[in-house]
Amino acid sequence: MKQVTGGVCAAQGFSAAGIHCGIRKNQAKRDLALIYSAVPASAAAVYTTNLVKGAPLTVTKAHLADGKAQAIVCNSGNANTCNADGIAVAEEMSALTASALHIAPQDVIVASTGVIGQPLDLTPIRTGLPQLAAALGDHSDQAAEGIMTTDTQPKEIAVQFTAGGKTCTIGGIAKGSGMIHPNLATMLVFLTTDCAISAPMLHAALTGDVSDTFNMVSVDGDTSTNDMVAVLANGLAGNAEITAPGADFTAFCRALNSVTVWLCRRIAGDGEGATRLIECCVTGAEDHATAKTVAKSIVCSSLVKAAMFGADANWGRVLCAIGYSGTHVDVHKVDVFFRSAAGTVCVCTHGAGVPFSEEEAKQILLEKEIEILVDLNAGDEGATAWGCDLTYDYVKINGDYRT
């Protein structure tokens, strides 16, 4: 497996584009994105667990009932959520996309991200979609920009792997900076692959992966109304279709995971106002569920996040987060380390503090990427969660989001 350029356009048969059509006031910001497969593709998606769901999710879920799709359209600047006409608007957005691409409306995945509760005016989208379709090409970067809201940078990646003796590619773009606490900010992830895989196996791979990747990311503890992870697989790599578990399915899942973990880290590191990426690795758990819960509890802790912003090795906050995680952990067995490119420091052994250099710890925590290592010393299971520090800028960004 190797990383390649091209994002969602790296796989055979995929093209993309992103333009400014007028949804957002800032003309320098792209606000409409399109991903297109030259042939119909197997498709799967997972969605937010928030009971308040954006209209695009409802429409997309209906469209994917047959496990097929050929395009993904997404606007930024408006979530099309909690609107009386939201379903009709999302359906028309699908129809407009289908008309521009000469495909069926039910083969369009539709997504939106932005402000909740404001009507989505389709006028700029009606004008923009023909232009967007005409601009399709090797423009994954433009599509990545078109789905951004408070993100500071686009997020795209692609990798190549082998399945059935054929070289296959999987790529992805993502947005997410705030309201990131998925159980599947708004967090949107769009993946493309030329690997031939059936819709049921594609769905199995995606749901299995999301549980340990995107559902383990938290920026601010808020679960968005519009979270979606969607994948298209058009089969143009020419491998024998994956229809059951086996070596090829394992290879596909590993490639998928390499893409999703990379995107998880970029989403967490680009949290609103963030200055540091936090990766919490929990080992020594008696079961996987416990490891996941503990890791997520730590990265969700506002006090831990604030301590990381201040480069303060306040390990007691880590123990506190473990204690209220709801798991049955013997805190008297817990070891805690902080690690970064500047080194590693042990701050807690068997649930009690140990002498360490505060200055050394501070230098470790001043790095842009920080690891919180927790050993529960109770078993062989582990899990990883991602988050970011909590800064003054987070409040500033969200205090005037609508203005």
PLM segments and residue spans:
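A structural signal for small-residue-enriched, beta-sheet-centric alpha/beta enzyme cores
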Residues: M1-A88, E92, A98-T403
